[in-house]
């Protein structure tokens, strides 16, 4: 078993850095009196790795958001704000952005500098890591600079009205002294160093992750830093095991949102703080363009018309979701006012689309074939630990069959999903859930752009690319909405994927030993860095 021991502060290192680095947070404050204790956190599946720059696993991101937090975060109303940056300003056409960092220190007392931030952007783009091309791809590094130790001036090749809202919210800072010598970032085992309230002390794959308090983090509780000394993330096989651990007192909080059946088991106990928040993301099916049959828009339209959103929401999700008929989430009312809709549920219409396109069942097995005899039989890959996923798959496979399409179920763990779908692009159809899709009038390029990391279906369209690029640089809001409507019309005609519903995410925390739990929109729920630093022992 792989076992990782992260950086540990030694006395000699602390002494050597005392003169030029930060000093430990002062515990002699009102909040400082609340410091101490260990919180146990339940995870419904194993995190992939602490190298969150190179993969897109939610549980890994939840852990590492306490270690290397994003510099921009989301408030209770779903609005983004500068969290670990003092300010972010642009010129009139949004081609120059000036970002000023707050005083941040790695857990050995070394300052986080503007050079680290500029290095992060350049290194990620040069190595084509994850989201870097999406958020920093417009940066002209020859013209960008660091005027002082905490200020970066990013010069862009064209305007982007939400440049920092995107980059700051999605890409944590990389430590230049650690990463500059790394030639292959995707296989690199990160040290676990943190500039947030914690650093990784121990990471045991498939079992647990232990975080220790960063004594140099002062951006909470009037300079005192985080209240809790240690956070242990424990891995369980599925949601049921995680919830049982909460009931047995093995964990204090569940990191993942819970199904309606799990909530019903907990809600009678007044010790549990149970809160819901509307997701900023949504569930979806993606159609891999590596499969020749799925390259046919008629097949994609038929599959989309076989998705019964009402049944998915009311039966599989027990009402804890909102159907998503438009390409954009209904959370964003301005952007869905045009009511441009995906195909309505109608399996007879789906069958007719396929029949007219030449897909017929020639051998009576219930599965249609193409003109050259290839059956419309697809494997759907999904994380087996997703909430209510068995019911969702039952509804989808039954309705697809009515149109003459076979859906073969392939539940996998998070690491396999990442390897086969988001990283490997070796699949037919995937079912997954975006945690957060934000700034949709400018950041859809990160999902659908040619060669973008999240475009793992490899649906590459220059017409779409031009629309998405135009949205990014348009400074007039109303004109961006017009462009977005053009894109939505393009989407429903081409269907690179099919959007299903927006979950109403419900989370649970035990208040027996700890208090201060607070829920905001976003991926990390009770564990969101800006909120979790205030959780303390009773």
Locate each region found by the language model.
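Append "and occasionally in soluble cytosolic enzymes with long acidic Gly/Pro-rich linkers
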Residues: 212-213, 295-398, 486, 536-537
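Ligand-site clamp/hinge motif
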Residues: 186, 216-264, 406-408, 413-414
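Gly/Pro-rich hinge or "lid" segments in bacterial periplasmic/extracellular proteins
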Residues: 76-77, 169-223, 230, 238, ...
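N-terminal lobe/hinge region of extracytoplasmic solute-binding protein
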Residues: 42-92, 122, 193
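Detector for C-terminal structural segments
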Residues: 204, 208, 306-337, 388-397, ...
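A structural "hinge/loop" feature
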Residues: 43-61, 84-86, 110, 163-172, ...
